[in-house]
Structures are given as structure tokens and as C-alpha cells.
Amino acid sequence: MANLRIALVAGEASGDILGAGLMRALKAQHPAVQFIGVGGPLMQAEGLTSYFPMERLSVMGLVEVLGRLRELLARRKLLIQTLIEEKPDVFIGIDAPDFTLTLELKLRQAGIKTVHYVSPSVWAWRQKRVLKIREGCDLMLTLLPFEARFYEEKGVPVRFVGHTLADTIPLQADRTAARAELGLPDGPLVALMPGSRGGEVGRLASVFFDAAERLQALKPGVRFVLPCASPQRRVQIETLLEGRNLPLTLLDGQSHLALAACDAVLIASGTATLEALLYKRPMVVAYRLAPLTFWILKRMVKSPYISLPNLLAQRLLVPELLQDDATPEALAQTLLPLIDGGEEQTRGFDDIHRTLRRDASNQAADAVLSLIGQKQEAL
């Protein structure tokens, strides 16, 4: 039997992690498989021949995309030509939908099987993208169950594979060990997580610090920990903290340790809320956008919730305080009872964790190999 040739394209670090896990699982069933495409250091370490550095696809923000648009379009065109000539057994686009969905469509039209791993947020907004997905994608692999239900309703072949974070984060995190590792004392501890991007931090950090000062008055002895997403964010946060006297420990990265160590979390809506959920830490979710952006999104977004815990629970499991509702007083008062309580939240989190814990990389590999008729049956 000829060796399998699988093409993969990832556009950012999170996709590189998922891609590497998937490649390991594919190699377990087909040790001689060949991998071509675009990926980062983790995928290359698993044997991917990357046609160009993944960083060339890692662009955030409209202005940056426009500045690189000519290069991105040229790279995509060349990639389409190369992969059509190479004729892999299957192509897997990992996240990066603005780049990979068109790639999948062109390759499928050329007779190559296509898989998309990680659903874009079509269930929330720009739902017409599902038409392109249905036309260009033989199989959608979703990390979350409500995404799979959406695609089933839209007639897109789909498999819910679970989330790799749910596989790696323990069902019960050791709070005492995490505090010891961070050198934090006993007593009430709140994690402040105002986001990873400069704009988010600029809009939320000062509000979070004001809320923390109110919490100090409401719960004497409370301390705070804030994991900084990058050196740039740390500088920004230190500037915003000038003149304040909060009992706050800043960390460089280490968000998982901060979550394991804390009793409750004040957090910006985003992927970090899933991490807080998996660590079973009660949370209050807040978000502020530029007023015009909020006005536009309010009219475009189809979902009643914005935070992943509520989307996963399909109910209001965690408080969401958005825009003008995200005042320091409201945040402090909502968070206060969760520091020593929050059992309803944590019970819901445990149920969700068990649902997402499915050995995602092996599930994804099985789905890909079944699609192309190459699944090895267990002996």
C-alpha cells in the first residue's frame, strides 16, 4: 500500500499545537505517513515539510491584514497550485478560516478530500460562511458540541472531537500546590484576567482594578493575581497600576497556574474563560468594546450569550457584564459571593469538562482516516 500523504495548514500557535497532536495520532496508525503544508515548530518537529514559515500567515487586525493582503493572496495561490500538483490523500485546514476555507474549496474542486479542524464562529455571526464551508469541506471537526449541532442542522458533515485542553487539564486542579509554586499565601485569592490584547486590556484593566479595590473593602484580606499575556501587556498593566496600592502579584504568562491557585476569577470574555471553566474556578465575565463596534456586533451576533461557559451550558451559568453594565461596583458585588461559594457554577463546569474530555487528537485522527478509508481497526 502506498504511503499516505497528508497536507495540513495552520496559521497560528494554537493551530500548531492542535496540528502536532493530530499528526502524532495519525502516525500511531500510519507510521510511514508523509506530511506537507504549512505549520510551526511543533508540527515541523512531528515531521511536517513546511513550504514557508507559519508566521507569514499570523496576522491580527484589519490594518495588518490589509498591509499584508498581497502577500497572503500570493502565498495562497501558490499553495493551491502546489497542493493540486502534489495530490495529497487529504487536506486539513486548522483554524485560520479566512485563509484556509478558500484553500479547501479550491482543493475540493480539484478532487482532493478536505477537512476543517476548529469551527469558525459561524453560529454567532456571519452565518452565510456556512455555505462556503458546505461547498468546500468534506468534514468539519469541532472542539465544542454546540458547534456540531449547528453544522448538522445546516447539512455539513461534522464530527465533535472534543477539546485538547480538556484532555490535558486535570479534572481536579491542586490549589495548594499551585500557590506553593507561585509563592502565594493562604487566604482568599482572585485572579484578574483582563485579556491578552492591548485594546482589551486598555478598556478593562482599570475597571478590574477599581473592582478589586472595592472587593478589598468588602472582603478584607483578599489578594489578587494577574497573569500577563506578554511582556508588552505587563508594561501596559504596570503603567495602569501606578498610584494604586493593590495586594496584586503580576505573573509572566503562567495563566494556568494562576487559575489553579485562585478561588474565583474576574475575566474578559474569550478563550481564557474555557480555561477557567476547566480549572473549575467560579467566574464573572466582563467585556467592553468601542461603542460603535458594540453597536454593530449587537445587531450581527445571533447568540444570546457571549461567553464560552454559557454557550457550552446553553444557559446563563456565569454572569456576563457587558459594556456599560461592567461597572466596578457591579463586578465587585457579583464576584463577592463566588470567592467562598460558586458551587452551582463548578458543578456545571465539571459536567462540561467531562463532555469535552474525549481524547481529541485521536478522535480527530480517526475521523480523518475514516473519511479517506484508511482507519486501522484495533486488533
Curated annotation (Swiss-Prot):
Record key words, sorted: Glycosyltransferase, Lipid A biosynthesis, Lipid biosynthesis, Lipid metabolism, Transferase
Family stated for the protein in its record: Belongs to the LpxB family.
GO biological process: lipid A biosynthetic process
Cellular component GO terms held in the UniProt record: membrane
Catalytic activity annotation: a lipid X + a UDP-2-N,3-O-bis[(3R)-3-hydroxyacyl]-alpha-D-glucosamine = a lipid A disaccharide + UDP + H(+)
E.C. number(s) listed in UniProt: 2.4.1.182
InterPro entries in UniProt: Glyco_trans_19 (IPR003835)
Coiled coil as UniProt keyword: no
Record gene name: lpxB
Species for this entry: Pseudomonas fluorescens (strain SBW25)
Record's protein name: Lipid-A-disaccharide synthase
Top-level taxonomy: Bacteria, Pseudomonadati, Pseudomonadota, Gammaproteobacteria, Pseudomonadales
Record-level Gene Ontology MF annotations: lipid-A-disaccharide synthase activity; phospholipid binding
Pathway: Bacterial outer membrane biogenesis; LPS lipid A biosynthesis
Top-level taxon: Bacteria
